[in-house]
Amino acid sequence: YASMYNVVDSFDTHARIPEHFAAVDAAAKKAGKVSLISCGWDPGMFSLNRLYANCVLPEGKDYTFWGKGVSQGHSDAVRRIEGVKDCRQYTIPVEKAVEAVRSGSNPELTTREKHTRECFVVAEEGADLAKIENEIKTMPNYFSDYDTTVHFIIEEEMKRDHSGLPHGGMVIRTGVTGMEKEHKHVIE
């Protein structure tokens, strides 16, 4: 679309942003159009939070926790799997990791240590549930780096319990100030 229109895009597959930027940038420049990418929740608003916190605490470390909430992009990725009728995917911060960050200890955390993912899936009648679950749990850039739980539910349960789209998260920066780096700070 960047070759035909001015575009505002909330593309959020973090691992593929450089590739997406290159493609959109080339098309927009060639057509004389303007394109703004990665301007949603994260990247986007959370990126501004990280920028602000880095200005205040230039010596430190950033941590981003998403959720608890529905990821529309991840839910859509699951809905594209053969045999899936509907899905809501929740990203959930690991409380132990959040507490470690808030302590100011600057822990090194893997993706798996920071978040879990939980999927509520309505499958088509006769679908191979084991195959669907495996495809979800091994999907690169979405689930393979996380502990993921898959629940198969019926449509009525989806409508009753998972029709909303709650979302949230937090950006935390921990760092030090002072001539001897003697003061620990946390910005949240």
Please give the residue ranges for each predicted region.
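Oxidoreductase and adenylate-handling cofactor-binding alpha/beta cores
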Residues: 22-25, 45-61, 76-87
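General beta-strand structural signal in soluble alpha/beta enzymes
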Residues: 7-10, 35-39, 65, 89
